Amino acid sequence: GNTVQAELQKAATRLFCTACGITGCSRTDSGVHALEYAAVLEEHGTSVIPEEAVPRAMNTYLPQDISVFRSETVPDDFSIRRHVVGKEYLYLIWNGEHRNPFYTDRALFYPRELDMEKISAALPHFLGTHDFRAFMASGSEIAETTRTITDIRAEREGDFVRMFVSADGFLYNMVRIIVGTLLEVSEGRLSAADLPSVIAGGKRESAGRTAPPEGLYLHRVFLRR
């Protein structure tokens, strides 16, 4: 399928009538959503479009499921990846008895009971700076696996459960594996007390399953100003 980057590139090329480069703030897996995403557009022509008009102009060329809502001019040597100091992900769970057709591919349908007390007891173990190797998809070739989680929380509102994780950076599938692990804590397959040794052990098989992509949203991007 088409990527968001490819669609942005196509729209920018049509808008500015010249080939444009797009660099995103991070990679997202297929099936994952973004409520906020930052990207740098390199426009090589001599644009006469004022920056505040770019979002509306871009949106006329973008498909219905992508929307630009803000733009600003940055220096030529601006590197988006170097300016990202953190990100927050949201994982959305529909915990109703029956599936919600409005949230097909937009939330994980989980009809079993979710034990919010058990989940809440598990959350503090993830906070702080740890080697999160156990929460990285096997086969990833990343040497440095230490990350700092600055905030992690779970909230219920009716049949929706929202899990938020903020960190200075994330490993491949890290949030989805954390969510899968929290589901297994709720199910009683793991306990909150197991988590320090799971984290310290660094073995992927000790952590929980990888939750499906459809519930995951890149929620906020924190940029150094």
What spans do the regions from the language model cover?
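Structured-RNA-binding interfaces characteristic of tRNA pseudouridine synthases
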Residues: 1-225
